[in-house]
Regions:
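Aromatic- and charge-enriched surface segment that lines or borders ligand/interaction sites
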Residues: 109-152, 165, 171, 316
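Alpha-helical secondary-structure segments
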Residues: 137-142, 169-171, 213-214, 248-252, ...
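Structural transition elements
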Residues: 215, 345-381, 399-401
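Detector for C-terminal structural segments
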Residues: 225, 304, 329-358, 399-408, ...
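Ligand-site clamp/hinge motif
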Residues: 236-286
C-alpha cells in the first residue's frame, strides 16, 4: 500500500484507506489493555467498504499549546495558526500516492500537468462559502496571487502566476520546475477564499473568517478561546466526495489556547477539555498507563541530524572515513532513550519515511548502526588528527543541549574531545554559514512531502552554500537532478541517497514523537500531513459526553 500522506485516521487497532478523491474507512476497535497507539503520518491499510461510523456530538473541547495570534488566511505560518488552519479554511487538494497525480481533491475536481512549470486545476462548480458567495476560478487565482504578494512564505517567490482559464479552471504557473512545489502550495500553503468575502472583511479575516470550511467561526478571544460551529450549509453534500479533512462530527468545537505546556495536561485531567493536542513527551507519561485516556503517538515531521564542516581546510574536508567514524560512534537508540524517553523513531535516511517518494528498502539497509569497533577502525584509516577539539554547534534548546552532551560522551569513548557551542537562533543562523565557527552542526529539519525537498540543503545555490559547506560537483548535480520534474525518478532518487550515505555528508538520527491525548470515548483522530489535529474529523463513541 502506497502512502497517503495527508491522512491519519488513528483508531485503536483500526485500518484505513484513502481512495482517489474520497475516503473509505473500516474500523475494528478493541481497546483492551491498549494505552498508546503509534501513528505514522500517512499510515494506511486496505479495506473494501466504508463501515466507519462516529456519533454526532454536540460539543468537543480541545487544548492547543500555541498562541494563535490571528486567523487570517495569508499571514505567516506560526505553530498556532497551523494548528487551526485546516479547520478554518480548505485547500485545493491533499497528498494521495494512490492517485495518478499524487493528489486528491478537496475543492479541486481534477488537475493535469500542462508542462514542467504549469498545472491546470479545475474546481467543483458548486462551491459556496459560509456567506453564500459562489467560489469560482477567479477566487482561486485571487487566493494564490494574494498569498504570493503577501510574501509570508519562502515559497511565495516561486509562483509566477495563477490565471483563469475558464469559470472553474485555473493555470498555476511556477518559475521553477522543482518537484513538489506546486503540490505543496495546493495542499498546505494557500488557503482558498472568495475575493468577495476577503475584500468585504474589515480586518482581513484576522478574527472574522469566511471560508468554504465545514465550520464557521462564531467567537474568538485572542489568547484564550476560539469557537467554531458546524456549517449547516456546507457546500459538499456528496458524502463520497467529502475529503478526509472536511468531516464535522462535532456540532461545536471550542479550542482552549493554553501556552503553558503543563497546563495542557491539567486541562485534560480536570475535564476542561476532551482532547489535548501536541502534548510533550514530558507530560504524556501520566496518561500512558491511566484508564480513561487514549494516547496517540505521532512520528513528527521534524528529525534530528548532524552534518560536518567539509569546507577546504576543515578537519572533515575530503575525509568520509572520519565522518563515518563519528556516526558509527553515536548510539542513536541511546539518544532516543536519554533525550526523548523512548518517544522517538530511529532514522534510516536523510528523509522522513512518510514522504511520498521514500524508498522503504532504505529501512533494511545499513545506516551507521552503533559500532564502536568499526568507528575505531574508520578513525584509524582516516588518518585524522585526533588531538583536535571538535566544535559541536547547535541552536540553543533543551533537547539539543542534551543530545550534544550525549554525543560528546560517545565521541570521548573514541578518544575525541568536543566543545559544545549552543547559540540563540539569530547567531546560529549567521554562524552556520561560516566555516571558521564549527566542525559539526546538530539541528533539525522538517520533511513533509518529498524526500528530495531536502536535496536543496546539499547544493550550492547562489551565495548560499550546502549545509555541510562542501564543494562537490557530483553532489551538486545529483541534488539539482532529483529536484527537477524530469529527473525525479526512483533510480535517480536512490542514486542521490546512496551518494549522500557514501560521502556521509549528513547523518539523520531520529524523529521525535509528539502526542495527541484524548478521553477514551474519542475512538480515533485525524491529522493532516504535518501532524496537526482536526478535531471535527475525530471518531466519537456513543458514550462521549462534554
Amino acid at each position: 500500500m502506497k502512502k497517503v500522506l495527508s491522512l491519519v485516521l488513528a483508531t485503536l487497532l483500526a485500518t484505513t484507506m484513502i481512495g482517489c478523491g474520497n475516503a473509505n474507512v473500516e474500523s475494528t476497535t478493541d481497546q483492551t489493555d491498549v494505552k498508546e497507539t503509534q501513528v505514522e503520518l500517512g499510515s494506511a491499510g486496505v479495506v473494501s467498504e466504508n463501515t466507519e461510523t462516529s456519533a454526532q456530538v454536540e460539543e468537543v473541547s480541545v487544548a492547543i499549546s500555541y498562541d494563535v495570534s490571528n486567523l487570517a488566511p495569508f499571514t505567516s505560518a506560526t505553530s498556532g495558526r497551523l494548528s487551526l488552519i485546516q479547520t478554518l479554511y480548505e485547500y485545493l487538494a491533499y497528498y494521495d500516492a494512490d492517485s495518478d497525480t499524487g493528489l486528491s481533491g478537496i475543492l479541486m475536481k481534477e488537475c493535469e500537468k500542462i508542462d514542467n512549470y504549469t498545472t491546470r486545476v479545475t474546481i467543483y462548480d458548486y462551491i459556496y462559502d459560509s456567506a453564500g458567495n459562489h467560489l469560482t476560478a477567479s477566487d482561486v487565482a485571487f487566493s494564490f496571487n494574494t498569498w504570493a504578494e503577501a510574501g509570508n512564505s519562502v515559497k511565495c517567490k516561486l509562483l509566477d502566476s495563477c490565471t483563469v482559464v475558464d469559470e472553474f479552471t485555473v493555470d498555476i504557473k511556477l518559475n521553477t520546475d522543482s518537484v513538489g512545489d506546486v503540490e505543496n502550495m495546493m495542499c498546505g500553503l494557500v488557503p482558498i477564499v472568495t475575493q468577495a468575502a476577503y475584500e468585504a472583511s474589515d480586518d482581513g479575516m484576522i478574527e472574522k473568517v469566511v471560508s468554504t470550511s465545514p465550520y464557521i467561526v462564531t467567537d474568538y478571544v485572542e489568547g484564550s478561546t476560539l469557537t467554531v460551529e458546524k456549517n449547516p450549509n456546507y457546500w459538499q453534500t456528496n458524502e463520497d466526495l467529502v475529503s478526509p479533512f472536511s468531516h464535522s462530527n462535532a456540532d461545536k468545537i471550542v479550542y482552549h489556547i493554553v501556552t503553558e505546556a503543563s497546563q495542557v495536561s491539567t486541562n485534560l485531567e480536570t475535564d476542561v477539555v476532551d482532547i489535548a493536542a501536541n502534548m510533550t513527551s514530558s507530560e504524556v507519561g501520566r496518561f500512558q498507563n491511566t484508564d480513561g485516556y487514549n494516547v496517540y503517538a505521532i512520528a513528527g515531521t521534524n528529525f534530528n541530524w548532524i552534518t560536518f564542516n567539509c569546507s577546504e581546510g576543515g578537519m572533515f574536508y575530503n575525509n568520509p572515513d572520519f565522518r563515518k567514524a563519528i556516526c558509527y560512534a553515536i548510539d542513536a537508540n541511546g539518544i532516543i532513550e536519554g533525550v526523548f524517553n523512548g518517544g522517538a523513531k530511529l532514522s534510516k535516511a536523510y528523509a522522513n519515511p512518510e514522504c511520498i517518494d521514500y524508498n522503504s528498502e532504505w529501512d533494511s539497509e545499513e545506516y551507521y548502526e552503533y559500532n564502536i569497533e568499526k568507528a575505531k577502525e574508520l578513525l584509524a584509516s582516516s588518518g585524522a588528527d585526533t588531538s583536535q577539539t571538535i566544535r559541536i554547534m547547535y541552536p540553543q534548546t533543551t533537547n539539543n543541549k542534551s543530545m550534544a552532551q550525549i554525543i560528546q560522551s560517545y565521541l570521548l569513548e573514541l578518544g575525541l574531545n568536543c566543545e559544545l557551542l549552543g547559540y540563540e537562533s539569530a547567531l546560529y543562523q549567521t554562524y552556520k554559514y561560516e566555516a571558521g565557527e564549527w566542525d559539526i552542526i546538530l539541528d533539525q529539519k522538517q520533511s513533509v512531502d518529498y524526500v528530495t525537498s531536502l536535496a536543496s540543503t546539499l547544493q550550492v545555490s547562489g551565495d548560499t552554500p550546502a549545509i555541510c559547506l562542501v564543494d562537490d560537483e557530483k553532489m551538486q548535480d545529483l541534488a539539482v537532478l532529483v529536484q527537477s520534474n524530469e529527473g525525479h525518478t526512483a533510480e535517480n532518487v536512490n542514486e542521490y541517497m546512496e551518494y549522500v550515505k557514501e560521502q556521509c555528508y549528513v547523518y539523520a538520527i531520529c524523529q521525535e514523537n509528539f502526542y495527541h491525548v484524548t478521553e477514551s470515548s474519542v475512538n480515533g483522530i485525524v491529522t493532516n500531513f504535518k501532524g496537526w489535529l482536526l478535531p471535527g474529523c475525530s471518531t466519537f463513541g456513543d458514550d462521549f459526553e462534554r
